[in-house]
């Protein structure tokens, strides 16, 4: 089968961090995807953090200053206006009013901190003779300073030490603890082997950013604590992007997982700075998808699974123009089987998509694409794990039973088909792989792709999401590329252009 004439490649190669020179002393804004799974404040899978390390190292090894931006989860988010109002309120509460409280506040500070404050005062010469020890005259010297100077010195101290001295200032507007990136900063520091600075509010980090030195790394707090990040109003997104863009000189994106978002950090910042380059991870994602959507080694097989046909309509339609074989699994397979007249018991079926299934089967026949559906199933009467589930003789599923995985004969046929191909792309599990009795089909696909890659150079791509998670459960596999972007990879395979990729500079 040859690629259809209207099957256009919707992705082009982009300038990468390797093409960007002279990062020394440059403040590099790097959008990463640290949207990692968390449980009780602990990271359960740090793959996305580890995947960004090579680009971070490139920046700091060249003497650049690396400022990382990311989201985590789906916090409610507050508007910038409300956020700024909240910041001002908290600062106001921390101020000293009516010439009261300044000396009292100073008096309870540690001796070392008092000495540091006095060293910046008009009485610094006198202060050089004062010891940090208790009752050496530090508070008395501070008390003699003019009220305006006292206020100025203390506000400077609070700005520089708000974590310890002013805890009410050390959280972002819109802060929700379960979505904070602070645990990510800790893990990143462990992986890098160096301190990672953490800015508690991505839109109030100007002072912290200004203190960074060459080779430093800073992670800003969750950008989705502000609703403008993914807001529908373009002007509001731009306003947020302008603040963030003011922190940096260079923009690099390594966040393929968020590349389908037209957001303040994915598209707004590079538009304002007038440039954007891909990090090593983004470059790899673009390179592999450009190959599989452009001119891949033939034959090319697409393995598509998941729960709903409706979620994969555009993918199936688009990929049908590019592939030689299509293997369908997961619950979506039962809609196709019913469309062909087979019994599916009480398995999931999208009645409204039966006509689409028939149409796709006809298109495939016309284009000489071989669609292969399950020929046996692993079933049970309920959606739960059992020691000995029913394995059907053929495509038909008995009444009162639901299929929860592809059967052994189907596994054999699918593995044989992958073995005939030179390229394979997989999106979506073959069954309910989270339950051990129904995991064999999904794991067999992952292992077949790994073996093919290792033994005969199969170009294998796993399109993120559940497929990537399933592949990781199989242990170390020799897959050419496991995408970090579930939604982004799906949209690419649907033939869509990703805003977060399109905005980057094309490779010359």
Swiss-Prot record:
Disulfide bonds: none annotated. It comes from Trypanosoma brucei brucei. The lineage of its organism: Eukaryota, Discoba, Euglenozoa, Kinetoplastea, Metakinetoplastina. One of its GO terms (cellular component) is cytosol. The keyword Transferase applies. (2R)-3-phosphoglycerate binds at residues 32-35, 48, 70-71, 73-74, 224, 260-261, 308. ATP binds at residues 307, 312, 331, 403, 434, 466-467. Its EC number is 2.7.2.3. Its cofactor is Mg(2+). This is Phosphoglycerate kinase A. CDP binds at residues 306, 311, 330, 428, 433. It catalyses: (2R)-3-phosphoglycerate + ATP = (2R)-3-phospho-glyceroyl phosphate + ADP. In T.brucei, three genes code for phosphoglycerate kinase isozymes, which are transported to different cell compartments. It comes from the Eukaryota.
């Amino acid at each position: 089968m040859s690629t259809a004439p209207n099957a256009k490649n919707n992705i082009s190669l982009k300038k990468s961090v390797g093409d960007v020179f002279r990062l020394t002393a440059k403040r590099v804004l790097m959008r990463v995807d640290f949207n990692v799974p968390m449980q009780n404040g602990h990271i359960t899978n740090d793959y996305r953090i580890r995947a960004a390390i090579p680009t971070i190292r490139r920046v700091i090894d060249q003497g650049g200053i690396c400022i990382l931006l990311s989201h985590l989860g789906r916090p409610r988010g507050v508007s910038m206006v409300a956020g700024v109002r909240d910041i001002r309120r908290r600062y106001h509460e921390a101020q000293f009013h009516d010439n009261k409280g300044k000396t009292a506040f100073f008096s309870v500070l540690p001796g070392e901190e008092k000495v540091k404050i006095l060293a910046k005062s008009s009485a610094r010469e006198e202060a050089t003779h004062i010891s940090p020890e208790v009752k050496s005259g530090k508070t008395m010297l501070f008390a003699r300073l003019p009220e305006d100077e006292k206020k100025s010195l203390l506000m400077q101290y609070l700005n520089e030490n708000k974590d310890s001295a002013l805890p009410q200032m050390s959280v972002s507007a819109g802060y929700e603890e379960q979505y904070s990136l602070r645990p990510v900063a800790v893990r990143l520091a462990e992986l890098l082997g160096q301190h990672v600075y953490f800015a508690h509010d991505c839109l109030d980090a100007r002072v912290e950013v200004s203190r960074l030195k060459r080779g430093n790394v800073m992670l800003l707090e969750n950008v989705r604590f502000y609703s403008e990040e993914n807001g529908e109003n373009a002007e509001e997104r731009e306003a947020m992007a302008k603040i963030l863009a003011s922190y940096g000189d260079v923009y690099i994106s390594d966040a393929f997982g968020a590349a389908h978002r037209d957001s303040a950090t994915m598209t707004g910042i590079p538009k304002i700075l007038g440039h954007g380059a891909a990090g090593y991870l983004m470059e790899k994602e673009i390179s592999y998808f450009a190959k599989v959507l452009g001119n891949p080694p033939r034959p090319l097989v697409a393995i598509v699974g998941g729960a709903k046909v409706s979620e994969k309509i555009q993918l199936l339609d688009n990929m049908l123009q590019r592939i030689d074989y299509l293997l369908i699994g997961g619950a979506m397979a039962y809609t196709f089987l019913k469309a062909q007249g087979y019994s599916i018991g009480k398995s999931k079926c999208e009645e409204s998509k039966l006509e689409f299934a028939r149409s796709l089967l006809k298109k495939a026949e016309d284009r000489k694409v071989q669609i292969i559906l399950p020929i046996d199933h692993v079933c049970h009467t309920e959606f739960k794990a059992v020691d000995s589930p029913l394995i059907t003789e053929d495509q038909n599923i008995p009444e009162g039973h639901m299929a929860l995985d592809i059967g052994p004969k189907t596994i054999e046929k699918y593995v044989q088909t992958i073995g005939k191909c030179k390229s394979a792309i997989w999106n979506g599990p073959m069954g309910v792989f989270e339950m051990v009795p129904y995991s064999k089909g999904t794991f067999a696909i992952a292992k077949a792709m790994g073996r093919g890659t290792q033994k005969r150079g199969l170009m294998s791509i796993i399109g993120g999401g559940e497929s990537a998670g399933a592949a990781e459960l199989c242990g170390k596999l020799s897959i050419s590329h496991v995408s970090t972007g579930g939604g982004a990879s799906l949209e690419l395979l649907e033939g869509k252009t990703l805003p977060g990729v399109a905005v980057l500079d094309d490779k010359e």
